[in-house]
Amino acid sequence: MEALKADVTQGLSKGSLITCADNTGARELKVISVAGYSGTKNRHPKAGIGDKVTVSVTKGTPEMRRQVLEAVVVRQRKPIRRPNGTRVKFEDNAAVIIDDLDEPRGTEIKGPVAREVAERFGSIASTATMIV
């Protein structure tokens, strides 16, 4: 994993409900923890675009519900600042479920994916239909 080029303001915290942007059968995910987060005592972990998070499936098919999985945040409502000065924000907060090798578990990704995610996770970029 490489560093992000954009200044990502983290718009999701622990407990946030986000939509699942792939076709694994999950529809809504709840953020449980953020991988690699080291913060102040008693502070909720924050996540932004391109971060790996541990999620619990709250809505979806009966086989997927209540599972604890790894996911990557691909969209967030909070604007992020790119090096050229532009700011990018999306309509919703969304994530893609991944496996142990950082490959997406689904075969298609619905909606746009941020360019920062595509640079960090090549397998998600190849599966995505639109990169913004």
Curated annotation (Swiss-Prot):
<dbReference type="GO" id="GO:0006412">
    <property type="term" value="P:translation"/>
</dbReference>
<dbReference type="GO" id="GO:0070180">
    <property type="term" value="F:large ribosomal subunit rRNA binding"/>
</dbReference>
<dbReference type="InterPro" id="IPR036853">
    <property type="entry name" value="Ribosomal_uL14_sf"/>
</dbReference>
<dbReference type="InterPro" id="IPR019971">
    <property type="entry name" value="Ribosomal_uL14_arc"/>
</dbReference>
<dbReference type="InterPro" id="IPR000218">
    <property type="entry name" value="Ribosomal_uL14"/>
</dbReference>
<dbReference type="GO" id="GO:0003735">
    <property type="term" value="F:structural constituent of ribosome"/>
</dbReference>
<protein>
    <recommendedName>
        <fullName>Large ribosomal subunit protein uL14</fullName>
    </recommendedName>
</protein>
<keyword id="KW-0689">Ribosomal protein</keyword>
<comment type="function">
    <text>Binds to 23S rRNA. Forms part of two intersubunit bridges in the 70S ribosome.</text>
</comment>
<keyword id="KW-0694">RNA-binding</keyword>
<dbReference type="InterPro" id="IPR019972">
    <property type="entry name" value="Ribosomal_uL14_CS"/>
</dbReference>
<keyword id="KW-0687">Ribonucleoprotein</keyword>
<comment type="similarity">
    <text>Belongs to the universal ribosomal protein uL14 family.</text>
</comment>
<comment type="subunit">
    <text>Part of the 50S ribosomal subunit. Forms a cluster with proteins L3 and L24e, part of which may contact the 16S rRNA in 2 intersubunit bridges.</text>
</comment>
<dbReference type="GO" id="GO:0022625">
    <property type="term" value="C:cytosolic large ribosomal subunit"/>
</dbReference>
<keyword id="KW-0699">rRNA-binding</keyword>
<dbReference type="Pfam" id="PF00238">
    <property type="entry name" value="Ribosomal_L14"/>
</dbReference>
